[in-house]
């Protein structure tokens, strides 16, 4: 398996740079929301939506999250690249989706992401 090739093929090109916010991820999530997999499960202190995205039908459940610390966007980019692989309808993605259900909170701390800080707005 050529990991460099996989990385290049499934990298979400719209997520780049150091700062990743809800404004960056919402268009991608909404594009992928073909079967009501995207849910708003809460709101931040400042009123920003906190999303959950579910994909797969397997009995093994995996919980994924990113940006608990708002200034750590690298994990969000990696998470979206992985979710993009799951969208690919390849033999690998179908095997993963048949065996696992992935529950994702793509940005746990949207306020911190907007302010580019580790803390949330709850002071």
Locations of the language-model features?
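Structured catalytic-domain cores with a bias toward divalent-metal coordination
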Residues: 1-123
């Amino acid at each position: 398996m050529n990991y460099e090739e996989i990385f290049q093929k499934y990298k979400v090109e719209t997520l780049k740079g150091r700062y990743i916010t809800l404004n960056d991820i919402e268009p991608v999530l909404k594009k992928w929301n073909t079967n009501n997999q995207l849910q708003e499960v809460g709101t931040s202190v400042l009123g920003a939506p906190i999303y959950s995205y579910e994909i797969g039908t397997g009995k093994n459940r995996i919980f994924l999250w990113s940006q608990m610390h708002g200034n750590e966007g690298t994990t969000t980019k990696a998470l979206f690249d992985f979710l993009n692989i799951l969208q690919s309808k390849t033999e690998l993605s179908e095997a993963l989706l048949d065996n696992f259900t992935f529950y994702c909170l793509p940005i746990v701390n949207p306020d911190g992401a907007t302010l580019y800080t580790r803390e949330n707005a709850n002071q």
